């Protein structure tokens, strides 16, 4: 069912036109088959680090930092027996002969991607079943493969699960998921926002447009779960996903190209010029000084144009530096300049600029406890702009040339290796657009 008259042109990650006059709802999480598939698979996919399990057992370093127990070591050739372990895990997890259980070994058996059968999620209240069922199946598989006795079973357990349940998550463990532990969520419906920037960047192999798309899909889909993208506010979030996340009408790439030798300020200029040309904003009145005050002809579309400009500003500024550290300042002052220039609200009606104030303090200023890449939409500092503030941070981390202490390679190697093996996670733009074209005439 088409609610909105909006039509968008879709472009690929390199700015090539794919299709015109596509209904806005074709990229909606409620209709788009790729987004639905991504959400289903993100809940049932678990990354396992078999190489680190082997090392953990060999050194007795169970439970994470500071938890080395020299007397509790096991010399097990986990990686060289990865196929046997994978076969046993699959056997344990399967519910029926033809279900969708899937096991994939990566990097010669050093890592393993486990997709639990959908039937297990259907009888669970939330997604923890994927991590827990995988962990217990893996533990049993290792015990069986190496004939581990009852006195060492707990050591195998700790090498997989880490410090849980002494801690709220799987700290020190060797399994991971993009969504993290639900016990760490900041509020109701925040699970899809609990994906660190570095995870998105690693999953998409530092491809900027795909990292932006991945982040935007997760952030904006979360707004449907949280009750934000409902009724009068649904169109705002769909336009944000289309223009900021999926480069609708090629806005993002055109803004970047036009300002390849520009600044955050020149990106603002491009956004205002394009919004005027497209009739998204109009001159409200001209002051005695000649300064124009504007008003939106379409306030939701103005927000979408501004959001597209924000990720372009991140690409221009952080790309010029080849460093991500200034992204909080980019988000803050892009919005500040935009508001002064137009008299209109910035991205997400001030919330992204407000987010950037705290983000700047906690990632860069007096405190500076963590680099931009470790933040997510569930973080107490960056949670406030729902859907619009995390994609530009992903753009910045893709442009970073290794300046960060908390780099994607450091924080997200396992997640990146496993989840990038799935096409729809690695190249979400391509597959969201493909399936949008499949359904556009059926809405």
Swiss-Prot record:
It catalyses: coenzyme B + methyl-coenzyme M = methane + coenzyme M-coenzyme B heterodisulfide. Keywords: Cytoplasm, Methanogenesis, Transferase. Its cofactor is coenzyme F430. Disulfide bonds: none annotated. One of its GO terms (molecular function) is coenzyme-B sulfoethylthiotransferase activity. GO terms for biological process: methanogenesis. It is found in: Cytoplasm. Coenzyme M binds at residue 367. Pathway: One-carbon metabolism; methyl-coenzyme M reduction; methane from methyl-coenzyme M: step 1/1. One of its GO terms (cellular component) is cytoplasm. Its main location: cytoplasm. InterPro entries: Me_CoM_Rdtase_asu/bsu_C, Me_CoM_Rdtase_asu_N_sub2, Me_CoM_Rdtase_bsu, Me_CoM_Rdtase_bsu_C, Me_CoM_Rdtase_bsu_N, Me_CoM_Rdtase_Fd-like_fold. Belongs to the methyl-coenzyme M reductase beta subunit family. Component of the methyl-coenzyme M reductase (MCR) I that catalyzes the reductive cleavage of methyl-coenzyme M (CoM-S-CH3 or 2-(methylthio)ethanesulfonate) using coenzyme B (CoB or 7-mercaptoheptanoylthreonine phosphate) as reductant which results in the production of methane and the mixed heterodisulfide of CoB and CoM (CoM-S-S-CoB). This is the final step in methanogenesis. MCR is a hexamer of two alpha, two beta, and two gamma chains, forming a dimer of heterotrimers. This is Methyl-coenzyme M reductase subunit beta. It comes from Methanococcus vannielii. The gene is mcrB.
């Amino acid at each position: 069912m088409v609610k909105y008259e909006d039509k968008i042109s879709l472009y690929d990650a390199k700015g090539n036109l794919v299709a015109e006059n596509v209904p806005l709802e074709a990229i909606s999480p409620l209709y788009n088959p790729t987004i639905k598939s991504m959400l289903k698979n993100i809940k049932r996919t678990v990354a396992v680090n078999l190489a680190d399990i082997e090392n953990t057992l060999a050194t007795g370093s169970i439970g994470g930092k500071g938890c080395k127990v020299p007397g509790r070591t096991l010399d097990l050739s986990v990686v060289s027996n990865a196929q046997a372990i994978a076969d046993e895990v699959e056997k344990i997890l399967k519910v029926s002969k033809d279900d969708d259980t899937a096991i994939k070994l990566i990097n010669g058996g050093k890592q393993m991607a486990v997709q639990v059968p959908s039937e297990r999620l259907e009888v669970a209240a939330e997604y923890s079943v994927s991590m827990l069922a995988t962990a217990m199946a893996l533990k049993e598989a290792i015990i069986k493969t190496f004939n581990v006795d009852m006195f060492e079973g707990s050591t195998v357990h700790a090498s997989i699960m880490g410090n849980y349940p002494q801690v709220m998550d799987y700290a020190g463990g060797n399994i991971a998921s993009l969504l993290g532990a639900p016990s760490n969520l900041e509020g109701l419906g925040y699970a899809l926002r609990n994906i660190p920037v570095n995870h998105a960047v690693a999953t998409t192999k530092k491809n900027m447009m795909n990292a932006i798309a991945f982040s935007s899909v997760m952030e904006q889909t979360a707004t449907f779960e949280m009750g934000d993208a409902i009724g009068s506010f649904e169109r705002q979030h769909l336009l944000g996903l289309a223009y900021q996340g999926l480069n609708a009408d090629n806005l993002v790439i055109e803004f970047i190209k036009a300002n390849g030798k520009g600044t955050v300020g020149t990106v603002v200029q491009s956004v205002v010029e394009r919004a005027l040309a497209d009739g998204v904003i109009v001159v409200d009145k001209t002051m005695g000084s000649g300064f124009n005050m504007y008003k939106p002809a379409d306030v939701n579309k103005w927000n979408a144009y501004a959001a597209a400009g924000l990720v372009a500003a991140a690409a221009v500024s952080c790309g010029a530096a080849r460093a991500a550290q200034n992204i909080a300042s980019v988000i803050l002052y892009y919005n500040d300049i935009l508001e002064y220039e137009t008299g209109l609200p910035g991205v997400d009606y001030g919330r992204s600029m407000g987010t950037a104030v705290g983000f700047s303090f906690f990632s860069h200023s007096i405190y500076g406890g963590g680099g931009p890449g470790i933040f997510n939409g569930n973080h107490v500092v960056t949670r406030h702009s729902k859907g619009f503030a995390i994609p530009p941070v992903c753009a910045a981390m893709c442009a970073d040339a290794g300046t960060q202490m908390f780099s994607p390679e450091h924080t997200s190697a396992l997640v990146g290796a496993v989840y990038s093996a799935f096409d729809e996670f690695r190249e979400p733009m391509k597959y969201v657009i493909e399936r949008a074209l499949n359904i556009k005439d059926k809405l």
